């Protein structure tokens, strides 16, 4: 089995329980995180085109199709966010709600442009997802990481995720190579409870 590139893609599941907005955030390194707007279709299409074809193997949606991205914008999905550096799309994260017996969970998809990897943008977007989950009353976040993506694995574990399982040969790339899939989880309701206990009375 070949080794997948670090920082390519992570998938997580979460479930929003209450409504909420996704405010713009800016870091000291001038990375802006915000929800998608109509003007982002072209830039986001170019962003996904910049991701190596081999990396896109792990995507669940046809991100090479501008109509797919236009569809995201058309429904005003505030759970699809981008990271901007000097007005260039550096990263993308999506938080998607599950259905049926998984309606209490959801899915997070994270992609960082090759030239911006290793700069902490992935961590910033992952942290944003956890914060949004707390705001939405999510009970549990589950992250899927392809085995061998050590930097991604380390990033999520530092954010409080723990490995729950390993699915053997669960992912196959365009070359037919199979990879194990690691399942990590984070009980964000417990985090919210601890923050509530630690917060001083007004």
Regions found by a protein language model. Give the residues of each.
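Conserved beta-strand-loop-alpha-helix junction that forms the acyl-donor binding cleft
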Residues: 117, 143-153
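A short beta-loop-alpha structural element at the N-terminal edge
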Residues: 31-44, 187
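C-terminal "cap" of GNAT-fold acetyltransferases
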Residues: 169-202
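Conserved acetyl-CoA-binding loop-helix of GNAT-fold acetyltransferases
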Residues: 118-131, 135, 154-158
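Glycine-rich phosphate/pyrophosphate-binding loop shared by adenosine-nucleotide-utilizing enzymes
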Residues: 29-31, 86-92, 179
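Acetyl-CoA-dependent GNAT
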Residues: 38, 50, 54-115, 126, ...
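Conserved catalytic-core motifs of GNAT/GCN5-like acyltransferases
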Residues: 142-145, 157, 162-179
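Conserved GNAT acetyl-CoA-binding A-motif
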Residues: 133-145
């Amino acid at each position: 089995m070949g080794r997948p590139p670090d920082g390519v893609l992570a998938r997580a599941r979460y479930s929003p329980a209450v409504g909420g907005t996704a405010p713009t955030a800016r870091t000291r390194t001038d990375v802006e995180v915000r929800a998608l707007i109509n003007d982002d279709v072209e830039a986001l299409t170019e962003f996904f085109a910049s991701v190596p074809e081999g990396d896109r193997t792990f995507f669940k949606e046809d991100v090479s199709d501008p109509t797919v991205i236009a569809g995201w914008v058309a429904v005003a999905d505030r759970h699809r966010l981008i990271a901007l550096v000097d007005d260039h799309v550096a990263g993308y994260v999506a938080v998607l709600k599950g259905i049926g017996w998984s309606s209490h969970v959801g899915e997070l998809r994270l992609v960082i442009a090759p030239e911006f990897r290793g700069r902490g943008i992935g961590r910033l977007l992952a942290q944003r997802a956890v914060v949004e989950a707390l705001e939405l009353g999510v009970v549990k976040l589950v992250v899927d990481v392809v085995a061998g993506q050590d930097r991604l694995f380390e990033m999520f574990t530092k954010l409080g995720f723990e490995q729950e399982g390993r699915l053997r040969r669960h992912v196959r790339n365009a070359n037919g190579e199979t990879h194990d899939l690691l399942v990590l989880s984070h009980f964000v309701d417990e985090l919210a409870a601890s923050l509530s206990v630690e917060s001083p009375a007004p």
